[in-house]
Amino acid sequence: MTAAPDVPLLRGVPARGGIYRADRTSPQTLADAGWRVGEIDSGDPRDLVIRVGEVLGFPSYYGRNLDALADCLSDRTGPTALVWHAWGDAAVRDPRTWSRLLEVLQEATERPGPPLALLLARPWAEVVPG
């Protein structure tokens, strides 16, 4: 198990998508800049797939699995940020699903189109499986 120091701290509004550490002001800063911001407080990576659909208003046909998550995230129409407050709990609780979920989200942040940012909140004393 290792800490995750390689995830940069978000300062201001990013020019492109990515995965960032968030401070208390990051969600409001992005919302003020016109980003759609969804906040999720779940320590279960499987639940996150459902919660993302809820907070971002995915269509009723959303399949609530990783493939459906990837598809719906690629259909975004404007800059979008997901603030995940309990990510450390998810990483420890189910490392395999956490890893797969992070891979899907990382790929989604790299796709062309409006930026997508995943903001990992909470104190950075969290432990992430390596």
Question: In which residue ranges do the predicted regions lie?
Answer:
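Positively charged, polar, low-complexity stretches
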Residues: T2-G130
